[in-house]
């Protein structure tokens, strides 16, 4: 499907943009600048831990909870994180392997059961907020999308990457660590900080040698929405290439789908297919 979109885009001669809003968040733009200036040397490893504290509400109480509806949360949720790994390192995934399972949600409840009608609503920890329209029972029988995933990736250039995604954590944030030959850079979303640790600093007991304080930005998605809107207008009005290209979107989707194929085949290594232009 993505390749058909790319071919149509090329044939049309029109402009196309992918809305990867995380590329526009200040905390990740700072990380990208640190990496691109060579501070941590030649990149060798990239790790992402995604604590999806609202996974039940966002993905298991509506259509996302079935493979027929969403295929995999390595795609529906993970495409942003996979893209960030690609963007921060400047390399795409070549092959992946993954393990995952349905470790919290799903069960034996009727598929048509909704939280407002459930006899256990007063005692269920996963009951939907009364104001939320996503209120299907997250323990219903049809739920078959994995809620706990681990994926490893080999990127172009030999970079090794890992992506961990859990949808029943008590907190909600992302943690990225990028490691190079001279040091590493890591972010803390809850604290609004980026840490840099250098190999030659001889301060191995300390968390960081440099700490960047990230100022809160106005606008949705951590201040990304106004910036991505401006980037879109620059593309439409002036022909400027957007920060996230259609190819970037396709490569993130392809890696996520390959990860799902792997975890559903016992963790077999899957090659990420090349674009069929």
Model regions: which residues?
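Aromatic/hydrophobic pocket-lining residues that form π-stacking "cages" and hydrophobic walls in ligand
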Residues: 5, 31, 258-259
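Short Gly/Pro-enriched turn/cap motifs at secondary-structure boundaries
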Residues: 73-76, 139-144, 166-167, 219-223
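Beta-loop-alpha module in the N-terminal Rossmann-like domain of NAD(P)-dependent dehydrogenases
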Residues: 1-7
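A general structural signal for well-ordered alpha-helical segments in protein cores
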Residues: 2, 28, 81-82, 229-230, ...
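Beta-strand scaffold of nucleotide-dependent catalytic cores
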Residues: 46, 97-99, 162-165, 188
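C-terminal helical cap and adjacent loop that interface with cofactors, partners, or active-site loops
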Residues: 148-150, 156-159, 169-277
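Glycine/proline-rich active-site loop of Rossmann-fold NAD(P)-dependent oxidoreductases
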Residues: 91-92, 143-145, 172-174
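Predominantly a Rossmann-like dinucleotide-binding segment in NAD(P)-dependent oxidoreductases
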Residues: 10-17, 22-139, 151, 266
């Amino acid at each position: 499907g993505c390749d058909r979109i790319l071919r149509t885009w090329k044939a049309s001669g029109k402009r196309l943009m992918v809305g990867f809003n995380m590329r526009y968040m200040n905390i990740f733009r700072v990380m990208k600048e640190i990496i691109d200036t060579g501070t941590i040397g030649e990149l060798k490893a990239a790790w992402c831990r995604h604590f999806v504290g609202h996974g039940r509400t966002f993905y298991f109480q509506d259509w996302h909870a079935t493979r027929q509806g969403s295929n995999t949360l390595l795609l529906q949720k993970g495409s942003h994180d996979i893209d960030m790994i690609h963007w921060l390192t400047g390399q795409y995934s070549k092959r992946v392997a993954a393990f995952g399972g349905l470790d919290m949600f799903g069960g034996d409840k009727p598929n048509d059961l909704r939280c407002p009608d459930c006899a256990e609503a007063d005692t269920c920890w996963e009951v939907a907020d009364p104001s939320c329209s996503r209120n299907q029972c997250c323990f219903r029988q049809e739920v078959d999308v994995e809620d706990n995933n681990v994926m490893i990736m080999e990127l172009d250039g030999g970079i090794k990457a890992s992506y961990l995604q859990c949808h029943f954590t008590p907190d909600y944030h992302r943690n990225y660590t990028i490691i190079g030959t001279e040091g590493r850079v890591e972010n803390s979303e809850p604290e609004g900080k980026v840490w840099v640790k250098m190999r030659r600093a001889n301060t191995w007991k300390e968390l960081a040698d440099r700490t960047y304080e990230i100022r809160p930005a106005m606008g949705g998605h951590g201040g990304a929405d106004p910036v991505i809107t401006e980037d879109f207008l620059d593309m439409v009005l002036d022909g400027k290439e957007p920060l996230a290209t259609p190819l970037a979107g396709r490569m993130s989707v392809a890696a996520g789908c390959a990860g799902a194929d792997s975890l559903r085949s016992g963790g077999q290594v899957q090659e990420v297919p090349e674009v069929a232009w």
